[in-house]
Amino acid sequence: MKRLLSLAFAAIALTIVSCGGSKKLTKEQRNDLKDTYESFKRELPEAIVSMDGDKVKLVLAEAVLFKINSADINPDYIPSLVKMSKILNKYPKTNVLISGFTDITGTEEYNKTLSEKRANSAKAVLVDNHVSNSRIHAWGMGAKNPIADNDTEAGRKQNRRVEFVVMYDYKEDKK
């Protein structure tokens, strides 16, 4: 039952992401996303930032955000999340989708739970820095979609991460 609920939540989250990019953005909305992208690139040089259509993706890939079996964010990277919060607060009509990930150590169920905790840890930092809780959606992906080789310790460290996707909130503009 727990696995079914997790799968249902992941499906809903993916639907949110896919629906968000399917609507036509206004020129102002597109400019806001472009400004968000440029601000992330400028203020967070340690991050990999990309713009894909109507979404901005941010990954602190080189950062060791989490120790093994931990959802506690490495204190060295809290300032990066604080900077991110300040940028997000300039664009209050955007949503933030946070995906948590693990390396391959641990069972699938354990990794799913741990990755959810990691996503929620990142969410808590954003909320503590005045990003509205209602704008943030967090979920765990477990060991899916590794960005580095899980056969090495260095690769496993990189896979213990969170990824952020910023997209425009269309609900705010419906009249």
Where are these regions (language model features)?
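ATP/adenylate-binding site constellation spanning eukaryotic-like Ser/Thr protein kinases
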Residues: 9, 63, 78, 119, ...
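N-terminal targeting leaders that direct proteins to extracytoplasmic destinations
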Residues: 2-55, 79
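Residues at or immediately flanking beta-strands
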Residues: 48, 55-57, 95-97, 135-137, ...
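Periplasmic OmpA-like peptidoglycan-binding domain that tethers envelope proteins to the cell wall
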Residues: 101-175
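Early exported N-terminus immediately downstream of N-terminal targeting peptides
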Residues: 56-64
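Soluble non-cytosolic domains of exported or imported proteins
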Residues: 31, 71-79, 105-117
